[in-house]
């Protein structure tokens, strides 16, 4: 008899959908011991929850998250609501002995994140934050290449994450669809939303960031509130750029904006080391580009006439996660990054090796975001404390 993993998901938005899809597909693709059971979906709007439950196959709905986190038929609470609610839900769930997973960023700020780490660790419950881009096979392959020592001494890390959906001045802020623009609900703008992904990937590939200096910009300073209709100041950062110094001595540049006309979800990075480089951009997610100057196994330099960037189609069974899917040469998509993350989480429970980033891991990203925002306020270099 497979063990059951009875899930209660809180939030019916974009992330509620990506996570629900992952639960539904888990046992089709990954040979884990647990069977995911979509027990309950929670949203304050009961009609919305009922519609969502019918679409995704949840057994029941709940409109009060406080009831769900205490429900005896739930093993895992999965937080897919706006950032403002992560802290209270996660702590209540952990206090009730539930496993907890959450969408990124972990919290509104470092203080909240630290309290959440303490709660899950005191309760001894499994936990993870969905930094899903780590589970793009090409990015996981980049990690493998770095860990194999093929990049050599790192010099530069370069990340950009660009979108363009807030350029129009008449886009409101707030409400179900546009809470990412409301400071009191999101905590920050592109820093916590987009750069948090870039930072998580950077920490994973290139180690701790020691210090940062940042500049943020809010291009449109007032927007109508989607619910109240009142024109209110905009408190989020529309764009953020920062310089970073990694603990390993390499230098980083990070750039993010929601005003990069034409860019819908351009999440890219490059790492340059003495022996090689890797480059990825999510508009071509099935490729990882790798430049090898010096082969680490043979110690030989690549022959000059063969030197060049390799564009690796990450679709062989030997590539990360791909043995679970189709035949070589075929691709997987955005939704599978959540499925891969869930599979890692469940395997982590089964093997007693927690999937990363857990809450403590995600606290590192939160600290870098906090330092970036502080630096943007003060104009000074800020130590991250990592
Ligand atoms: C923002 O537009 C957003 O939906 C992020 O919140 C997600 O984390 C990102 O992956 C796609 O863009």
List the predicted regions and their residue ranges:
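Short acidic low-complexity segments
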Residues: 31, 60-72
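Glycine- and charged-residue-rich phosphate/anionic-cofactor binding loop of Rossmann-like
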Residues: 35-39, 347-364
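Predominantly a Rossmann-like dinucleotide-binding segment in NAD(P)-dependent oxidoreductases
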Residues: 133-234, 288, 379
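Glycine-rich, aromatic-lined ligand/substrate-binding cores of catalytic
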Residues: 193, 201-211, 216-224, 230-286
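C-terminal glycine/acidic-rich active-site capping loop/insertion
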Residues: 224-233, 241, 245-246, 269-270, ...
């Amino acid at each position: 008899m497979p063990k059951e993993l009875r899930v209660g998901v809180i939030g019916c938005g974009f992330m509620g959908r990506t996570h629900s899809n992952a639960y539904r597909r888990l046992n089709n693709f990954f040979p884990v011991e647990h069977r995911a059971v979509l027990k309950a979906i929670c949203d304050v709007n009961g009609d919305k929850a009922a519609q969502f439950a019918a679409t995704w196959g949840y057994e029941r709905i709940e409109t009060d998250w406080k009831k769900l986190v205490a429900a005896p038929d739930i093993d895992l609470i999965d937080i897919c609501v706006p950032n403002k609610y992560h802290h209270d839900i996660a702590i209540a769930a952990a206090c009730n002995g539930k496993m907890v997973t959450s969408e990124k960023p972990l919290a509104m700020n470092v203080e909240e994140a630290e309290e959440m780490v303490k709660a899950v660790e005191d309760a001894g419950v499994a936990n993870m934050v969905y930094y899903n881009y780590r589970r793009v096979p090409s990015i996981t392959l980049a990690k493998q290449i770095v860990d194999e020592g093929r990049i050599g001494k790192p010099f530069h890390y370069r990340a950009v994450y660009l979108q363009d959906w807030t350029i129009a001045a008449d886009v409101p802020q707030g409400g179900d669809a546009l809470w990412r623009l409301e400071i009191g609900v999101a905590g920050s703008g592109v820093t916590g939303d987009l750069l948090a992904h870039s930072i998580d990937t950077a920490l994973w590939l290139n180690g701790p960031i020691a210090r940062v200096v940042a500049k943020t910009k809010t291009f449109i300073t007032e927007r109508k509130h989607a619910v109240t209709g009142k024109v209110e100041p905009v408190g989020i950062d529309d764009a953020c750029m920062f310089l970073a110094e990694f603990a390993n001595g390499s230098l980083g540049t990070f750039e993010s904006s929601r005003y990069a006309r034409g860019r819908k979800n351009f999440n890219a990075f490059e790492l340059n080391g003495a022996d090689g480089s890797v480059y990825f951009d999510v508009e071509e997610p099935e490729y990882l580009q790798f430049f090898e100057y010096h082969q680490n196994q043979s110690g030989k330099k690549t022959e000059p006439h063969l030197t060049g960037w390799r564009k690796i189609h990450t679709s062989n069974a030997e590539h990360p996660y791909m043995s679970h899917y189709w035949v070589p040469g075929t691709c997987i998509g955005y939704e599978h990054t959540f499925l891969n993350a869930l599979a890692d989480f469940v395997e982590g429970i089964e093997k007693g090796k927690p999937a990363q980033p857990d809450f403590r891991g995600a606290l590192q990203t939160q600290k870098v975001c906090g330092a970036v925002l502080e630096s943007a306020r003060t104009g000074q270099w800020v130590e991250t404390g990592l």
